[in-house]
Curated annotation (Swiss-Prot):
Transmembrane segments: none annotated. GO terms for cellular component: cytoplasm. Together with the chaperonin GroEL, plays an essential role in assisting protein folding. The GroEL-GroES system forms a nano-cage that allows encapsulation of the non-native substrate proteins and provides a physical environment optimized to promote and accelerate protein folding. GroES binds to the apical surface of the GroEL ring, thereby capping the opening of the GroEL channel. Belongs to the GroES chaperonin family. It comes from Clostridium pasteurianum. This is Co-chaperonin GroES.
């Protein structure tokens, strides 16, 4: 899996949304 700023941002937003 490639870690990209945009990808990381999406993951973080999803985590925050589910938190």
């Amino acid at each position: 899996m490639k870690i990209t700023p945009l990808g990381d941002n999406v993951v973080i937003k999803k985590l925050l949304a589910t938190a």
